[in-house]
Design a protein with these regions (language model features):
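A polyanion-binding, active-site-adjacent surface
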Residues: 1-105
Length: 105
């Protein structure tokens, strides 16, 4: 999946659904989703993001998750089975340079 900058801008202020499995064993909270994450519907989805490789290297996931094109069913199943949740402090997506305002935080 590829997006132009103009296409990504269409996802500004969109949200990415929280992942909150039951039982929840470990919760990661980001500041706010990026435009790529909003476009794909997956947390930490930008190509090159080290979040999922770090989870895998730490032994928290059995396989390496690549969320750059959105979550695959087996990726969501793995996160749920492991009790790994992901949410954001500010739900609305923005470009990194436009991060959330102090009021939003």
């Amino acid at each position: 999946m590829r997006f132009t900058q103009a296409e990504l801008q269409q996802f500004r202020d969109r949200t990415v659904p929280d992942l909150l499995p039951d039982p929840l064993r470990l919760l990661f909270i980001g500041i706010n989703p990026g435009l790529w994450s909003a476009a794909t519907g997956a947390h930490f989805a930008r190509r090159g993001n080290r979040f999922y490789p770090a989870l895998h290297r730490a032994g928290l996931t059995r396989h390496l998750i690549d969320a750059s094109d959105g979550y695959k069913a087996e990726d969501l199943a793995e996160l749920h089975a492991r009790g790994i949740g992901i949410s954001n402090l500010v739900p609305r997506a923005s470009a990194p340079a436009d991060g959330p305002t102090a009021e939003a935080l």
